[in-house]
Amino acid sequence: MTNVPWLDACCASPLFRDLPRERTAALLEGRAELRSFSRGQDLDWYLRKLGIVTEGRLAVYNAGGTLLNQLHPGDMFGVSTVFTGYSSHITRISAAVNSAVVLIGEEELAAIFAEDFSVNRSYLAFLTDRIRFLNWKIDLFSASTAQQKLRLYLLHLRKEGSEVTVEPLARLGHTLGMGRASLYRVIEKLEGEGVIKRMERNRWQVDWERLCAE
């Protein structure tokens, strides 16, 4: 089983990336269901199953049809109904291109947790990251000015050092919920104040002390 092509994506997922490949293969033996689907096909059969994208790309939409996210090999989905009493999904997922996923049911996932606690810990860490991300999105939505939105976005990217990699500007405007003109104005303002410096491609240098003082 260690040579199956979809195992690479599972090993790259938040659930198994800290484990050796052989251990991941052993945990998934007899517990993973591989499903393939065509471009445009909706996923409506993964209730109470955790999914891992193994090939292609999935698109995630809200109830109104707005694109929320795109999932690539190694990304996970389906956590909103796993180990809960909910009988429906809060988003709609469809294949942006011909794709494949691995599905793990509740009972199988519980058995994996019982067999290897490190997977349980990784799952909890993934849920914590999701909560932090949702809180950030709420703060972003509540921000009243373009400058506040960009500030929150950059702080969300902050790691060690002064450099961050941002999204392409067209996508960044969509993420922040503002038009391109507004985005360019606030970028130029922060550049003029010495808060940020745009470098090659999508890399920016940020003066975190000045940004936090904004």
Question: Residue spans of the language-model regions?
Answer:
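Cyclic-nucleotide recognition modules
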Residues: 68-125
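Short beta-strand segments in beta-sandwich/barrel cores
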Residues: 33, 42, 57-62, 76, ...
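A short beta-loop-beta micro-motif enriched in histidine and acidic residues
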Residues: 30-31, 39-50, 64-66, 86-90
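Polybasic "coupling" helices that flank or enter modular domains
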Residues: 114, 118-180
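A cytosolic small-molecule/anion-sensing beta-strand core signal
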Residues: 38, 54-55, 72, 97
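Glycine- and acidic-residue-biased ligand/ion/polar-headgroup-sensing regions
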Residues: 48-64, 73-74
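Cyclic nucleotide-binding regulatory module and flanking cytosolic helices
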Residues: 1-39, 81-84
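Phosphate-/nucleic-acid-contacting segments
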Residues: 153-214
